[in-house]
Regions:
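Flexible internal linker/loop segments at domain or repeat junctions
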Residues: 86-147
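C-terminal transmembrane-bundle signature of multipass membrane proteins
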Residues: 161-167, 171-175, 188-204
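Signature aromatic-anchored transmembrane alpha helix within multi-pass, membrane-resident enzymes
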Residues: 6, 75-88, 139-150, 180-202
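Membrane-lumen/periplasm interface segments of specific transmembrane helices
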Residues: 1-105, 198-207
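Hydrophobic/aromatic-rich transmembrane helices and adjacent perimembrane loops
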Residues: 40-60, 106-131, 158-177
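C-terminal, well-structured subdomains that either form a transmembrane helix-short loop-helix hairpin
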Residues: 152-157
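Membrane-interface junctions at the ends of membrane-embedded or membrane-associated helices
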Residues: 1, 60-75, 130-139, 174-191
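Extracytoplasmic loop-helix module adjacent to an early transmembrane segment
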Residues: 142, 162-163, 208-209
Length: 209
């Protein structure tokens, strides 16, 4: 039964790829270019970009105080610091996402278009590692689910819109994280509404900033 439901859900994608022959999975991110397998299979690109996108969609939970984190606790954990920094440095060495591809997430675009470098983006990546680790640490299955999200991106490009509003839905459903549902009120809804209005505005001006 589950297999049947999955086949129904995937049917539009199969129709799009095989019948309409719009096979974006095996096309270069740059029009007229060739697929670069070093980029296609570079999961550090996906880890860095998707981590910052996941952080972006967690921000309204923090701003509305539906969820709280204690970064000081993470910073004081020596073994955790060592593991995250080693992961970050390895990823930093292999990261080669091309700004000409487009996408990369809002923080990647801000870093490139406003600061003209990737320093801000790398800073957000590192902060993302700490925050995501803390919110996922409540249950090991959270890490596995996040790994599946990363592996699900099988093409060269990584667009912010791929995860909108999927990440917020996952935070509220499949992820087991510390969210205080009792604090849902009009103020909370206003924060989420403002968040999405800001997001739509950024989508609108992304080609001009």
């Amino acid at each position: 039964f589950i297999l049947f439901i999955n086949l129904i859900l995937v049917a539009p994608a199969l129709y799009y790829i095989f019948y309409l022959d719009v096979n974006f999975l095996f096309k270069s991110a740059i029009y007229g270019g060739e697929i670069n397998l070093k980029i296609w299979f570079n999961y550090f690109n996906k880890l860095f970009c998707i981590s910052t996108i996941a952080l972006f969609y967690y921000l309204p939970f923090l701003f509305s105080k539906l969820s709280k984190i204690d970064l000081q606790k993470s910073f004081n954990n020596i073994s955790l610091n060592f593991s995250l920094i080693i992961l970050f440095l390895i990823g930093l060495y292999y990261f080669n996402y091309n700004v000409n591809f487009g996408g990369g997430g809002i923080f990647f675009q801000i870093s490139n278009k406003i600061f003209q470098n990737l320093i801000f983006f790398y800073f957000v990546v590192l902060i993302s590692f700490y925050i995501l680790n803390q919110i996922f640490s409540l249950k090991n299955e959270n890490y596995f689910l996040f790994l599946l999200i990363i592996l699900s991106n099988v093409q060269e490009t990584i667009y912010h819109k791929y995860y909108d509003p999927m990440m917020i839905i996952l935070y509220l459903t499949l992820f087991t994280i510390n969210i205080n549902s009792k604090k849902f009120n009009e103020k909370t809804l206003s924060i989420f509404a403002f968040f999405y209005i800001t997001l739509m505005f950024l989508y609108y001006i992304k080609d001009t900033i």
